[in-house]
Every structure is written in C-alpha cells, then in structure tokens.
C-alpha cells in the first residue's frame, strides 16, 4: 500500500519532473546558440517523461485493484493518460531530433521549416494535455480506495467474472 509519506515523496518527484519539462519547453529556444546544452536539456527532458510514465505504471501496479486482477479497470480509467504520454514522448523526441539536426552546425540560422512548425504546435498541444492528464492521474492514484478492499471493487470484480 502507498503510505502517505511515500505518496508525498512520489508526488514531489513527479511534480519536479513535470516542472522541469515545462521549463525546458518554455525556455529551450533561448539556448539555441549553445546546441550542446540544448541537447543535454532535451535528453534529460525525454528521460524525465519516461521516468514519469514508469512512476505512474509502478503506482498502478501497487494498487489493490491491479493486485486482484482488474487490470482492465485501471486501463479503462487511465487509457487517455497512457496514450497521451506515449504520444507526447514520441512527439518530443521527433521534435528534439529535428531541431538539433537542423541547428547543430548553424545555431543562429533560421531553421523553422513548415513541417517543423507543425510538429512544434502538435508537441506543445500534446504537452498541455499531458500535463493535465498526468496531474489528474497522479491525484486519482492517491485515493486510498484503490489500495484497499471495498464494495465498489467487489462489484467490479463480480461484473468482470461474469
């Protein structure tokens, strides 16, 4: 079971990773003259997104709902967040690779092609949705009802067995 102290620590780590992600999304263009630093920030950002997904999955695996075998209930509840996380990670990696590829040798040259601008917009829209769904999922996974036996869980288990 996820204890209050542990949940607070996990929540703090998750929010720190989300804050760093938001920081990189907001200010990475200011570092276009230093491509190595920008590359390192992009790599750390992508690893942070991956860590956030791993943390959410570990929190899901820790629930009583998962342990009694109602994985479909969890997947139904968190499908949007899992899909958005994968989409956001994919869009971020694609955007980072494309920007660094265009900007590596000539960092002060205008590199914003039409395709890159479209990818940028989709990546930022996915980022906003990712932040919202991730925070909502994190708060929902803090619900103590997910970590203990309860009547609604017994009803869900009975429906799943039929």
From Swiss-Prot:
Which residues carry a glycan? 6
Q: What happens when the gene is disrupted?
A: Ciliary phenotypes such as pericardial effusion, curved or kinked tail, as well as gastrulation defects.
Protein name in the entry? Transmembrane protein 138
**Function, as annotated:** Required for ciliogenesis.
Query: Where found in the cell?
Result: Vacuole membrane; Cell projection, Cilium
Q: Which residues form a coiled coil?
A: none
- Which GO biological-process labels does this protein carry? cilium assembly
Q: Which domain of life is it from?
A: Eukaryota
Organism taxonomic ancestry: Eukaryota, Metazoa, Chordata, Craniata, Vertebrata
Record's Pfam families?
Answer: TMEM138
Q: How does it sit in the membrane?
A: Multi-pass membrane protein
TM segment ranges = 7-27, 39-59, 80-100, 110-130
GO CC annotations?
cilium; vacuolar membrane
The family annotation for this protein states: Belongs to the TMEM138 family.
Q: Which of UniProt's keywords are assigned here? A: Cell projection, Cilium, Cilium biogenesis/degradation, Glycoprotein, Membrane, Transmembrane, Transmembrane helix, Vacuole
């Amino acid at each position: 079971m996820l204890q209050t102290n542990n949940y607070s620590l996990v929540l703090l780590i998750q929010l720190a990773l989300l804050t760093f992600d938001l920081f990189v999304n907001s200010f990475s263009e200011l570092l276009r003259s230093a491509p190595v630093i920008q590359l390192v920030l992009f790599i750390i950002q992508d690893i942070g997104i991956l860590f956030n997904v791993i943390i959410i999955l570990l929190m899901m695996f820790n629930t009583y709902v998962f342990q009694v075998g109602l994985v479909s209930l969890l997947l139904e509840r968190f499908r949007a967040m899992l899909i958005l996380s994968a989409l956001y990670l994919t869009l971020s990696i694609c955007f980072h690779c494309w920007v660094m590829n265009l900007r590596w040798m000539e960092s002060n040259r205008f590199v914003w092609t039409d395709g890159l601008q479209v990818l940028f917009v989709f990546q930022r829209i996915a980022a906003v949705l990712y932040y919202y769904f991730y925070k909502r999922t994190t708060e929902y996974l803090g619900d103590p009802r997910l970590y203990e036996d309860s009547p609604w869980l017994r009803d869900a288990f009975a429906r799943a067995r039929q």
